Amino acid sequence: GSSLNASGVAGGSGGGAAIYSSTGGTGNSGGYSPVEGYAGGDGTSGGGGGGGASEVGANSPVHSGGDGGDGVANSITGASVTYAGGGGGGGRTDGGKGGTAGAGGSGGGGAGTNDNSAPVAGTDGLGGGGGASGYYSGSSNGADGGSGVVIISYISTTAKAVGGTITSYTDGGDTYQVHTFTSSAAPHTITANGDVANTRAQQKV
């Protein structure tokens, strides 16, 4: 999100705008196809919701924060998990305005806040956006976004490489090995064991 009277910032998914009719940031800043993220919502007398990986953030209702856009589901780990939801916009309740904070989008988006309560951070490992602060929060800072994740899978009954946290699952008669990296502090390295004949990566996110 953005400070008072400021437009949202562009990114993979756009940031929601601050209050007073400012404009949400554009998404998909890398120009990718398919689209990697959507725009943030516009602000009125509340903040717009942050864009998610599958939809735009909601524009602000009167005095309330817009909801964050939903993320996108992916089954690379063998179970459907939704990633990269947008953070909720901030609302305001001063002077009896009765606004509400925006909800975070599915996929780890954090909720916004009203006034003096703290916004909710995005969920680590899902890459969700952080919620925005309220109008009289005492701070213009929103919550942090959640850390992302790198996942690689390939068909094999045994792991053919080392690196990350290794899990496996079976689907349709095929067994998949899954390498998951959640740390942002270390390089993400996958090293083949040497027995990689006829093995190819099936998916990566």
Predicted regions and their residues:
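Low-complexity, glycine/proline-biased repetitive segments and flexible coils/loops
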Residues: 1-205
